[in-house]
Design a protein with these regions (language model features):
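Exported/periplasmic ABC-transporter solute-binding proteins
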Residues: 1-17, 22-218
Length: 218
């Protein structure tokens, strides 16, 4: 479209957003790899005992927010080569309903953006860990990686690429006017104030310097 209409294009990589896989607090199985997730949305895995690290038995259901959401597009494009999702996958209508469904059903895996993992609704504090939540956050592993290297979606593992379920957030503007609300908003998001707004949603800024500190426990 941009080329067809000869529109100027401004584009910028803003942040990295990760998806978390969540399960019921009573579910002992909190480990999964990307290939198993792919087989779930292909309808090849429909029961918990089919997982390599699975210890429980029974039907396995995967729930997400809405059929036309960015979550579904990510799973289709990044995990399933653009094909529709199959098997025991169900839309709940919203991320809040996904979390509620997981809290009520031990056989369910929920897919939500990490921004929805909060101790209290409306809280903007970045979590240092996920252990105080009403749900459990699964460890996710890349195919071929040792199980000791599987991770949860903490910002450090998003930044290093060790957590696999990550997407890039871009902003695009094609407004040809040099002074417009759209262009002003574009530069606002790139500036420090806009970056602080994005960072408050638990998304990792592309220009963030991730600090690594060694901790010695005595």
């Amino acid at each position: 479209i941009v080329q067809q209409h000869n529109l100027p294009l401004l584009q910028s990589k803003l942040a990295y957003d990760a998806f978390a896989l969540i399960v019921n607090k009573q579910n002992p199985d909190t480990v999964i790899n990307v290939n198993e997730l792919r087989q779930i949305i292909q309808g090849k895995i429909t029961r918990w005992e089919q997982l390599e690290m699975g210890t429980k038995k029974g039907e396995l259901n995967l729930v997400f927010d809405a059929s036309g959401s960015s979550t579904v597009r990510y799973m289709k494009d990044s995990l399933n080569r653009g094909k529709d999702l199959r098997g025991n996958v169900f839309a709940q209508g919203s991320n809040m309903k996904v979390i509620q469904t997981v809290k009520e059903n031990p056989n369910t895996i929920g897919v939500v953006s990490t921004d929805w993992l909060r101790l209290h609704q409306g809280d903007t504090t970045t979590l240092q860990n996920f252990y105080g939540l009403d749900v459990r956050v699964m460890l996710v592993g890349k195919v071929g990686k040792a199980k000791a290297d599987w991770q949860r979606p903490y910002q450090y593992y998003i930044a290093t690429g060790e957590y696999p379920l990550v997407r890039t957030v871009w902003e695009l503007v094609t407004d040809p006017r040099t002074r417009s609300t759209m262009r002003s908003f574009y530069f606002f998001l790139k500036d420090n104030d806009g970056q602080r707004v994005i960072n408050s949603s638990s998304q990792l800024l592309t220009r963030n310097q991730v600090q690594i500190k060694e901790v010695v426990i005595k």
